[in-house]
């Protein structure tokens, strides 16, 4: 029981008595989340969470990734191996949460390559103070991004909208504003990472 009670206590203390979205692994659905709901709502006297979603397991080619098998990832391990942890996040976001995701370093290499290419395209954008925000483009692309996330939190479709922004026939200032807004959901730190990539390339060029 302590496991269930501590989660209710922590979330009520730090997040308040009403949550919009609560997520977890598919193995948390029962009995952990059902117990959380029962005890939290009995305590606060009203509905606790609006939405629940449960992510399927991260697997390797040999099966489920878990501590018990000795096969699991940590951010520090990825960093030790030279990976940007945000590339791993990008890798995860490219799959739907209802699908089991197969991890391999080859797949992560592909994701990191794609993430770096995305950052390079963003780094090439220029924020011109004299340009005005294209409100029509903002409306169209924001609706497209929201539709992707409203479709059962389809993050992979949301990622494709980032590329739609980059290809859109609008000015760079608008593109940067849209990317910053969408990144509030995706948390890929796109603009800062793109700026860092740009600065690293300048340093490399100056050292040659």
Question: For each predicted feature, which ranges?
Answer:
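Alpha-helical recognition segments enriched in aromatics with Gly/Pro capping
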Residues: 1-125
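Conserved nucleotide- and phosphate/pyrophosphate-binding catalytic cores
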Residues: 67-208
């Amino acid at each position: 029981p302590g496991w269930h009670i501590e989660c209710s206590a922590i979330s009520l203390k730090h997040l308040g008595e009403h949550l919009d979205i609560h997520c977890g692994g598919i193995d948390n659905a029962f009995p952990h989340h059902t117990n959380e709901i029962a005890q939290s709502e009995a305590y606060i006297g009203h509905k606790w969470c609006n939405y629940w979603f449960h992510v399927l397991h991260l697997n390797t080619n040999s099966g489920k990734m878990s501590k018990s098998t000795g096969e699991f990832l940590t951010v520090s391990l990825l960093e030790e191996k030279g990976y940007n942890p945000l590339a791993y996040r990008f890798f995860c976001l490219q799959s739907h949460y209802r699908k089991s995701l197969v991890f391999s370093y080859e797949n992560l290499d592909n994701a990191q390559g794609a993430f770096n290419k995305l950052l390079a395209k963003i780094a090439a954008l220029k924020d011109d103070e004299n340009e005005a925000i294209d409100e029509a483009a903002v409306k169209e692309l924001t609706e497209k991004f929201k539709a992707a996330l409203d479709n059962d939190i389809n993050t992979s479709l949301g990622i494709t909208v980032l590329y739609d922004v980059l290809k859109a026939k609008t000015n760079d200032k608008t593109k940067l504003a849209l990317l910053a807004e969408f990144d509030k959901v995706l948390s890929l730190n796109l603009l800062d990472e793109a700026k860092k990539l740009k600065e690293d390339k300048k340093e490399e060029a100056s050292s040659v």
